[in-house]
């Protein structure tokens, strides 16, 4: 079996968020556990680190037509951890300082989607399955049906679309379908059963309709996006395609995120860390010193490492933070960037309170230090497709405090439940500041009960969020899709 994974990001080449983490690790895990010939294609951004780019192997140049345009592009390859990565290089679209945020994103990623299909003869690689990720590559599915399905080597291909965050759908003006892809079918642009989305068109919706299967990054999120509350306007479509919708929990790279070997942290350690030296505690004391927090082993240190946006629960946090700092003996460290009013407010509180450090930036090395140093990790998201922060925190022995939503619900088992069982964290249900406040205070209370707390830490060490289980589920889905009757695909029956 041959699989081509298409993505806008893949670590360590290009990463701006969780998408890059997933696509840098999942294909490697699949390769390790199967005989599948899995390869990855992504844009050849100029921002790719030079230590990789200097080792790229040129394959050839190719002209990619995009409507009336003819873009000369170069295709290169690089073998990373036994997986071939292809890079589509184009000076006009990808020679930019950043990956996202440009006015011509429809054209930029429309080009990438078209190029994915056009370079296959050059590579002499025709996959059985193209595994697409988010809106940046979702147009491959309708393009395959309308422009390539009649061609030899393309007519048996299947597509899977993974939704990493339904909020981002690639919404553009309808004319782009004709302008970039020569798709003149009126219903594609104007029929709500197709790509039309409130007078615009949605690249992601094209993938949701025409892909043979849809996955998302946790079982709970797969259910949530079929509801009006979290379906982002396509809940009806997702409900209709529920038999083709799979929730597969993301993992993290245990080779990369490993407190025993992480070169970024102050002192490497094993969990549970109960010895006389208590290496994890040394990380805490060193971080407090570096961030100019009062140095204390007794005071619980709560970390927040995320984007400073409403989705991540900043409205709840900023509402209760002054009360917590006044009423509890606790320290907070924030690391991230986002909406200016959150950045400014946290900076203001940090000047006012000695027990709060606001690091308004993103620094991977500092993030690792904070994971290793913190006692608790706060993630009270409004919605959360999967979440990587709580998984990394658990790996480093930081006890999560989360809202029970999406992947947070699937990964954090409460330490106190109605049955009295002890799990790995603290959870709350409603998106409510006072409910979160109560849960944080409860966690602080249990932090000081050392025997109970040590039991939670011991429980953390039994959790495995490595990619092996997720990879097995994707392998199973690939095989299921390959053996599905090509002449009766679900996408066709849905549109009739």
Swiss-Prot record:
Belongs to the glycosyltransferase 1 family. Bacterial/plant glycogen synthase subfamily. InterPro entries: Glyco_trans_1, GS/SS, Starch_synth_cat_dom. Its EC number is 2.4.1.21. The lineage of its organism: Bacteria, Bacillati, Bacillota, Clostridia, Natranaerobiales. ADP-alpha-D-glucose binds at residue 15. It is an enzyme of class 2 (transferase). Pfam families: Glyco_transf_5, Glycos_transf_1. Gene3D superfamilies: Glycogen Phosphorylase B. Keywords: Glycogen biosynthesis, Glycosyltransferase, Transferase. The keyword Kinase does not apply. It catalyses: [(1->4)-alpha-D-glucosyl](n) + ADP-alpha-D-glucose = [(1->4)-alpha-D-glucosyl](n+1) + ADP + H(+). This is Glycogen synthase. SUPFAM superfamilies: UDP-Glycosyltransferase/glycogen phosphorylase (SSF53756). GO terms for biological process: glycogen biosynthetic process.
